[in-house]
Amino acid sequence: FGHYYNFYLMGETLWNDGNNLDLAEIHSQGLEVLMFDTYEDMYGEDASYIEYAQLMNLVDSVLQGCAEDEFQQAVFEDPDMPLDEMNLLHAQIYQDYMGYPLVYEWVDIHHHFETPFYYVSYATSAVSALELWADALENRDKAMQIYDKLTQYTINVEYLETLKEVGLSDPFSSDCVQRVAQALNDEMQLSGKPGSKAA
């Protein structure tokens, strides 16, 4: 629905090659986290479990996006790499990032073939969406204003400049990642069970 909201705001403007797809992913993922306040109405007593699952999905997007990008960079640096080496490389990278190897699954990701180096956008946008979620924990109205302002941007804009303009941090900065990680730890008590929030 975040993409739809952005299209609605664009009016007559059509998507073109100048679209910033990195921002478009934040439009989508950001709206997902801002909807958490409605989960209790929709899911009742299961709301905290579903919120937990959504947050873990975003964390997974960060890890997977970085893993696939590292894999792509290595393959593009060595275009003659044999297939068996690619499979082993993918397995090792996944072991490093996720704690388990995925050997052949990379062939199912069409981005590797159709839009190389785009997959990392899911990671950077997830960091920004998680920052928006952390902002909403402190001040939901402010987070909504940031999101609303962000959705005004799509065509012919610079990624990091736009994030700064709307009040979001550089997702590549360690400060941003540490703040998001701390918010996740504090809110979800990651050492505890899913759905067991701090009192």
In which residue ranges do the predicted regions lie?
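Catalytic Zn2+-binding segment of zinc metalloproteases
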Residues: 1-14
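C-terminal, non-catalytic "cap/extension" segments appended to globular domains
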Residues: 3-5, 30, 41-42, 61, ...
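Active-site catalytic pocket residues across diverse enzymes, especially alpha/beta-hydrolases
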Residues: 9, 35, 39, 136
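Short beta-alpha connecting loops at secondary-structure transitions
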Residues: 11-19, 50-57, 76, 109-110
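Short, structured coil/loop segments at alpha-helix boundaries
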Residues: 13, 20, 42-49, 174-177
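Alpha-helix N-cap/helix-initiation motif
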Residues: 13-24, 114, 118
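Post-HExxH zinc-binding segment in Zn-dependent metallohydrolases
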Residues: 18-46, 54-55, 60, 125
